[in-house]
């Protein structure tokens, strides 16, 4: 424990909180344009072809974003909305594309967890 004199001299430095989604610049979402849409393979114990897109954000930064859900309509030059949220088994993927916003279509035939995939309520 420091003495009062040491605190007078130095003071206490506040802890620096490091953001997990730096490219969003403290915004909840950011608009961007897809520059490349492709698939990648996940880390060791898992095996799949995960759909990802390289997105140039409106603030000038370029990020890799995951496309959640089954099937998508994205291609080069598609306008997308990007939110934070990493994909654990894809190194370097720290952002996700919001389904049902801008050029991204919602997931078809989605019954549960619809709001996450931009799916509207099914009509009876």
UniProtKB/Swiss-Prot annotation:
Residues 1-20 are annotated as: Disordered. InterPro entries: NA-bd_OB-fold, Ribosomal_uS12, Ribosomal_uS12_bac. One of its GO terms (cellular component) is small ribosomal subunit. Residues 9-18 have a biased composition (Basic residues). PROSITE patterns: RIBOSOMAL_S12 (PS00055). With S4 and S5 plays an important role in translational accuracy. Interacts with and stabilizes bases of the 16S rRNA that are involved in tRNA selection in the A site and with the mRNA backbone. Located at the interface of the 30S and 50S subunits, it traverses the body of the 30S subunit contacting proteins on the other side and probably holding the rRNA structure together. The combined cluster of proteins S8, S12 and S17 appears to hold together the shoulder and platform of the 30S subunit. Belongs to the universal ribosomal protein uS12 family. This is Small ribosomal subunit protein uS12.
């Amino acid at each position: 424990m420091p003495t009062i004199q040491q605190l007078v001299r130095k003071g206490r430095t506040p802890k620096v909180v490091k953001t997990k989604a730096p490219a969003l610049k403290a915004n909840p979402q950011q608009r961007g344009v897809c520059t490349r849409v492709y698939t990648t393979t996940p880390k060791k114990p898992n095996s799949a072809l995960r759909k990802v897109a390289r997105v140039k954000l409106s603030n000038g930064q370029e990020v890799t974003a995951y496309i959640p859900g089954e099937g998508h309509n994205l291609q080069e030059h598609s306008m997308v909305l990007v939110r934070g949220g990493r994909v654990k088994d894809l190194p370097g993927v720290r952002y996700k594309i919001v389904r049902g916003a801008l050029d991204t279509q919602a997931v078809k035939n989605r019954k549960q967890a619809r709001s996450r995939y931009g799916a509207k309520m099914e009509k009876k």
